Amino acid sequence: MKSHYPPLDVTQLRAGYQKGRDVVKGISLQALAGSVTTLIGPNGCGKSTLLKSMSKVLAPSEGSVSVNGESIHHLTATEAARLVSMLPQHPVAPEGLQVGELVARGRHPWRRRFGGLSKTDQQAVARACTETNIAHLVDRSVDSLSGGQRQRVWLAMILAQDTPVILLDEPTTFLDPANAIAMLQLIRRQAEAGKIVVMVLHDLTLASQYSDSIFIMKAGEVISEGRPKEAFTPDVLAHAYGLHAEVWDDPTSSGPVIVPRGLSESSEGINLKPLS
């Protein structure tokens, strides 16, 4: 059942890591409840910086991120953590931490100041473990798991946090194709349950198949946006990536299939460093 939760509004956002050197340059977007919004673009274009700025991880230099007219950056840390959860690109768990303990950390914004997990907390943790198919791993240490298992554990922690807004930076990292699709199907179910989901992906076809809205970035700016069939065009892919690609309609889904054919004629190519 879809929620009537207000959208997440990003307005003329500028953000970076050094004063006067913005990585994100005046971006505006709206992410709706019940939908998956995906940010894509070449390495270094500002996707992760934008995602961090949509939580309290990174304060913008200008602009706003708001829900129902209230700026996320004006909330307390606890208030923001009850509204927005974020899975960064390379999360690190303390050595020896058990899976169940890590997932339970998602309940931190909701826990009483003193005492253990409440019944509501325990139910949220159990539900998240079941949904991500890691219930059989709860007594294992996180560092004993494969990369794909760890990624599902981190997502379980985010789901246990039970926020209306979920931000995911490359959630299919370390996953083989079958597990990547399973992960994206799980993410889609969060949107179908009424959540606002914003994620960063690199796989163009997966982004097309599992997103409701696409924002394609280059050099800190959005150069194309809309539903996948609208956002992905050969000209846009050439501009964003220097890529010659064909965009095919997929009669079985709402998103197109992107078929790379090489570098575009205008591309300067990618300079790779020699291996030492």
Whereabouts are the PLM-identified features?
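A short, flexible loop at the N-terminus of ABC-type nucleotide-binding domains that lies
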Residues: 1-10, 14-26, 33, 74-76, ...
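The feature captures the beta-strand-to-loop junction immediately N-terminal to the Walker
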Residues: 40-42
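Helix-to-loop junction immediately C-terminal to a conserved catalytic motif
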Residues: 55
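Conserved ABC transporter NBD signature motif
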Residues: 63-71, 80
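Conserved ABC ATPase signature
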Residues: 116, 141-145
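Catalytic Walker B motif of ABC-type/P-loop ATPase nucleotide-binding domains
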Residues: 166-170
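ABC ATPase nucleotide-binding domains
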Residues: 240-276
